[in-house]
Amino acid sequence: MAVGLCVQVLCSLGGWLSLYTSFCCLNKHRSCEWSCRLVTFTHGVLSIGLSAYIGFIDGPWPFTHPGSPNTPLQVHVLCLTLGYFIFDLGWCIYFQSEGPLMLAHHTLSILGIIMALALGESGTEVNAVLFGSEITNPLLQMRWFLRETGHYHSFTGDVVDFLFVALFTGVRIGVGAHLLFCEMVSPTPKWFVKVGGVAMYAVSWCFMVSIWRFAWKKSIKKYHAWRSRRNEERQLRHNGHLKTH
């Protein structure tokens, strides 16, 4: 069983490395980070779809059955995701592109998935955490691509930022709090699984503080720009440069 899991994880790691290499070859005029973020975007979309199917259709429901035995589909998805996180953590360390908080998030994710696979249980809630963690990932990558291509300061950029902040706050913090509560009050999950859940939620709050600061600064900047435009229009009208009909 352990050998089979290791083979799945190694195949997943090889697949993500191959995809990254392919993106690098197809985008030779772009940076390595461009290709890595394409891989991250691909994993985000794929993991959202798979984890949503597991949570909402295949089951079991994470809010009522935390600590339940892993299903075969959960195991496959966790192995697929574990390979990705190993790839991305290695890439971030090699290129020194991320700070301690993101490295801590990746490390906790890797340890949490390994723990669920080794125990043969708690894949239900780990899959739910995967869904909550990745649901904002495509938006985060879109934001980076918009900035790189010079289209961030536009209506599209504002929509992406709004959806990112709204989803992060509502799903990762709001729904995440309810999931953590269900995990803590349930007698089924192991105590160290609960500790891991608390650690992941604490990391989410650290991200949330930074995101709220960003959202506040951007809102103030937008407000001041709007006020400035209105004052200019009023001044022009007052000076008679704008015709009124």
From Swiss-Prot:
InterPro entries: TLC-dom, TLCD5. GO terms for cellular component: membrane. Keywords: Membrane, Transmembrane, Transmembrane helix. Its main location: membrane. It comes from the Eukaryota. The chain crosses the membrane at residues 1-21, 38-58, 75-95, 99-119, 162-182, 191-211. It is found in: Membrane. It is a multi-pass membrane protein. The keyword Hydrolase does not apply. Residues 29-204 form the TLC domain. It holds the Pfam family TRAM_LAG1_CLN8. The keyword Membrane applies. Belongs to the TLCD5 family. This is TLC domain-containing protein 5. It comes from Mus musculus. The lineage of its organism: Eukaryota, Metazoa, Chordata, Craniata, Vertebrata. The gene is Tlcd5.
